[in-house]
């Protein structure tokens, strides 16, 4: 099923809906930080979370359309490596490159990846 991607001004982000998923990706400027810092930064936030690898891959798959929606509505384009919520052992976590949608392993405490949160609807 091709996802429905639409602008949602109330949540100030891009809403993405498929048969299995329904979430909004934050339109605010992305921050660069380590995975450990990202987890601490959003700890306790009930609404906005780090995305899963699957959610980031879906964003990467439709990045052209998503970036166009963000641009015309005052958001910032999504480019580069973005941290997922998923760990890869004790020292590493997964990030996804928006250029190809592939997941790569980065050191949690030293590698600076972009952070963009999602809210599951």
What are these regions (language model features)?
Residues 1-48, 91-92, 117:
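Extracellular adhesion/carbohydrate-recognition regions
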Residues 35-49, 53-109, 118-121:
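An exposed tryptophan-centered "aromatic clamp" motif
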Residues 111-113:
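N-terminal regions immediately upstream of nucleotidyltransferase
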């Amino acid at each position: 099923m091709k996802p429905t991607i639409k602008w949602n001004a109330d949540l100030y982000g891009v809403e993405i809906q498929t048969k299995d998923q329904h979430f909004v990706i934050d339109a605010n400027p992305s921050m660069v930080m380590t995975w450990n810092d990202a987890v601490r930064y959003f700890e306790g936030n009930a609404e906005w979370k780090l995305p899963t690898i699957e959610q980031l891959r879906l964003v990467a798959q439709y990045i052209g359309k998503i970036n166009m929606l963000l641009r015309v509505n005052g958001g910032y384009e999504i480019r580069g490596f973005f941290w997922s919520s998923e760990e890869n052992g004790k020292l590493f976590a997964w990030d996804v490159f928006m250029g190809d949608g592939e997941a790569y392993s980065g050191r949690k405490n030293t590698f600076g990846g972009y952070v963009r949160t999602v809210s599951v609807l």
